[in-house]
Amino acid sequence: THAFADAASAAAKVDELTWGQGADAALILVGTVDDEVVSAATAVIGKGGTVVITGLADPAKLTVHVSGTDLTLHEKTIKGSLFGSCNPQYDIVRLLRLYDAGQLMLDELVTTTYNLEQVNQGYQDLRDGKNIRGVIVH
């Protein structure tokens, strides 16, 4: 898994890592989704690849402008995801039990921790691409 602060960096690295074949998936995790972000994500996935959109968009604007031919000929998929398509009432309890039993390694996924006084720094680091999974500890 790789994370990028901008589309140009993502495209260059994906091309390098996949020898030009494209990524299997691109996850759009930005706060506000726009057509530029969706188009860039669609461009970096290869044949049969999937773009997953988790952010929200301005409901008054169209945010997906892609070639229907590209989708069909390369069998690409664009889908939205809310809470990872899980059932929060069931799955969160299950995940907590797995974590308590030592079967789900969440601590290793945290890239940086912040205390309450560092909240603004945490958001700035996220905007600057300095952390992927920052956690505020209270």
Where on the chain are the PLM-derived regions?
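Glycine-rich phosphate-binding loop and adjacent beta-alpha segment
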Residues: G31-Q103, H138
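Conserved beta-strand scaffold positions in the cores of enzyme catalytic domains, especially
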Residues: T1-A3, I78-G80, T113
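Adenosine-nucleotide cofactor-binding segment
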Residues: T1-S39
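A structural signal for short secondary-structure junctions
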Residues: W19-Q21, V44-I45, T72-L73, D128-G129
